[in-house]
């Protein structure tokens, strides 16, 4: 261990009884900050997190068994907040199509009002088992709520019969595309943001509402 790291590790006094939760929060905050700075969960190391908080790596393992658990905890916390915001918007009306439209608006608004958490959830690279764990956990619940919203539109006859998972994936990619562009290119001369979001949502809704003729068999 270098002298600098030794100094950093000693800079945080030993937690008193009952202060472990404070250290846990500090670890999550440092992990989140490093993920944003590096743009990749893979680039964040236990050593870097320990140095940022001013503790030794073994102190981290008292709260999290490995780096993957830290990354998941950060993502789950933001996914829960994100899901609550979008769900509240969707439940503000009984009309299933308007509910889906409001979910789309809330999705984009969350990203614009919380760009750094949004980057962590949807714009940092996560691969392999970690990505599966995140999507199957809190992220999976958020996506299932979108699938359910699409299914309600189908059940009401507003959308043509379709695979709700496939349809929801299309809606997600559309609103994510708008959100990520707005976050990544703030200097671009965008037209009215609300109008853009409504336009994209309307394209998705109309596409799912239309009945397409079956293509003719080639002669």
PLM regions: where:
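Hydrophobic alpha-helical connector segments
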Residues: 87-117, 168-171
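Hydrophobic/aromatic-rich alpha-helical bundle segments in the mid-to-C-terminal region
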Residues: 129-136, 140, 154-202, 211-219
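Amphipathic alpha-helical linker/stalk segments
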Residues: 77-100, 131-140, 151
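Short amphipathic alpha-helical elements of helix-turn-helix/winged-helix folds
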Residues: 30-37, 110
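Amphipathic, non-transmembrane alpha-helical scaffold segments
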Residues: 20, 24, 71, 75, ...
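Helix-turn-helix
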Residues: 26, 37-69, 73
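N-terminal intrinsically disordered/low-complexity leader segments
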Residues: 1-22, 212-219
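Generic hydrophobic, amphipathic alpha-helix propensity
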Residues: 23-32, 49, 74-78, 82, ...
């Amino acid at each position: 261990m270098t002298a600098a790291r030794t100094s950093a590790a000693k800079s945080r006094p030993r937690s008193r009884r009952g202060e472990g939760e404070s250290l846990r929060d500090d670890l999550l905050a440092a992990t989140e900050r490093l993920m944003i700075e590096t743009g990749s969960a893979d680039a964040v190391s236990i050593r870097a997190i320990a140095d940022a908080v001013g503790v030794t790596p073994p102190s981290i393992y008292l709260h999290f068994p490995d780096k993957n658990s830290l990354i998941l905890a950060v993502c789950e916390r933001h996914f829960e907040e994100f899901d609550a915001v979008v769900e509240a918007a969707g439940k503000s009306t009984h009309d299933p199509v308007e509910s889906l439209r409001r979910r789309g608006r809330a999705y984009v608004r969350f990203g614009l009002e919380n760009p750094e958490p949004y980057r962590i959830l949807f714009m940092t690279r996560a691969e392999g088992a970690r990505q599966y764990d995140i999507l199957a956990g809190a992220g999976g619940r958020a996506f299932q709520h979108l699938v359910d919203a699409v299914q309600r539109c189908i059940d009401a006859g507003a959308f043509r019969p379709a695979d709700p998972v496939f349809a929801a994936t299309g809606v997600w990619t559309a609103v994510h595309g708008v959100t990520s562009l707005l976050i990544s290119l703030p200097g671009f001369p965008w037209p009215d943001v609300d109008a853009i979001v409504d336009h994209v949502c309307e394209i998705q809704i109309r596409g799912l509402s239309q009945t397409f003729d079956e293509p003719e068999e080639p002669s």
